[in-house]
Amino acid sequence: ERKHINVPDFRDETEALVERYKAKGTHISVNFRSIVKNFSHVDRYTHSIHPYPAKLITHIPYFFINNSYFLKDGDVVLDPFCGSGTVLLESILANKRAYGADANPLARLISEVKTEYIDPVIIRKNLKKILEKSRKVDNAKIPEIRNSTLWYTKKALAELSILKSVIDGLTDDTIRKFFMLNLSNISRKLSLAENHFNVCHFVVNDRKILLQESYNILSIKITNKKQC
């Protein structure tokens, strides 16, 4: 378990909000961004590991979880609609046990990978193996995806399928899920979908097609640059 150093306790702020509510006698508006001050790293740790629509801002779970008005060390946090795991990660960082559930399989994958610590050395070692094996594969079975040729160019489909076939062969479940989530990231970026809408751009998008045709997924180079 990993603990934050000098994590604030928002008990006093909560008691002040309760008094405001009692005095007003009806609902009150709360701006969590103004309460959780000096919170510059809202996307710290693995919060930005994968995009997800309508993500909960980090300030809200940070306020409630680091708050002795509601919780104490060692308490259990349950998020029955965990989405991409924002609450789960903040719970773990605050030394709380966390459980989550979601009907969306992608959400469950994001949450699981986001909250599982993996040694960066192991990640880089496996990435090197994946790329080396992928470059030796001429072709792989393309997954059955409805309207796949509308979402991807043939080149992108072929390279993504090769990567998926190699990742599927990983024996360590934790590592496999980590790289499968990263494959999802790459797949979204290389698709012909609009960047801000979950629909396919059925009108030919020359810029997107040029990106797919020019980008060589398997040519990624591994550097020793330290990532924060």
Regions found by a protein language model. Give the residues of each.
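Gly/Ala-rich phosphate-binding loop of Rossmann-like dinucleotide-binding domains
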Residues: 92
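Glycine-rich SAM-binding Motif I of class I
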Residues: 85-89
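Conserved class I S-adenosyl-L-methionine
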Residues: 73-83
